[in-house]
């Protein structure tokens, strides 16, 4: 099963974890972005550049992802869509989305959008830290182990 990465917003340290995993596991990782990406040479890494525009990369991932694939994204609506197709969604902080958590996250996202639209400054998520990176690597390893069975 391939791995799809919403690469425009994916932190560099997470991409580096994915680059190493792709070669180690000989698993195809496709990074989808609306800008040029520089990736190390590997027959297991592929970039897919899409046109600039709102949700163009997300729509490409939804179109291509299949049941059992892994999608790396912090975009909650994208995660919800690929999960409807049977794909697994994992965010760069190592949280594997479930049906229950995705509903909760969509509700919170909509609430925060409403707050921002009314002029409230909500700030963004905290910076990615070493614990987040380790959690991501652990969840990725769990998924990779499941693929070996």
Curated annotation (Swiss-Prot):
Secretion signal, residue range per the UniProt entry: none
Top-rank taxon: Bacteria
InterPro entries, per the entry: UPF0178
PANTHER family per UniProt: UPF0178 PROTEIN YAII
Assigned protein family: Belongs to the UPF0178 family.
Protein name as it appears in the record: UPF0178 protein ETA_25650
Organism: Erwinia tasmaniensis (strain DSM 17950 / CFBP 7177 / CIP 109463 / NCPPB 4357 / Et1/99)
């Amino acid at each position: 099963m391939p791995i799809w990465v919403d690469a425009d917003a994916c932190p560099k340290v997470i991409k580096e974890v994915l680059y190493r995993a792709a070669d180690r596991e000989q698993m195809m990782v496709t990074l989808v972005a609306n800008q040029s990406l520089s990736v190390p040479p590997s027959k297991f890494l592929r970039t897919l550049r899409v046109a600039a525009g709102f949700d163009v990369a997300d729509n490409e991932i939804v179109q291509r992802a299949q049941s059992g694939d892994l999608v790396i994204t912090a975009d909650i609506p994208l995660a919800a869509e690929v999960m409807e197709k049977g794909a697994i969604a994992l965010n760069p902080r190592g949280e594997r989305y479930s049906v229950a958590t995705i509903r909760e996250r969509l509700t919170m996202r909509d609430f925060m959008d409403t707050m921002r639209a009314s002029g409230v400054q909500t700030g963004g998520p905290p910076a990615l830290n070493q614990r987040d990176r380790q959690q991501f690597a652990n969840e990725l390893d769990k998924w990779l182990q499941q693929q070996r069975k």
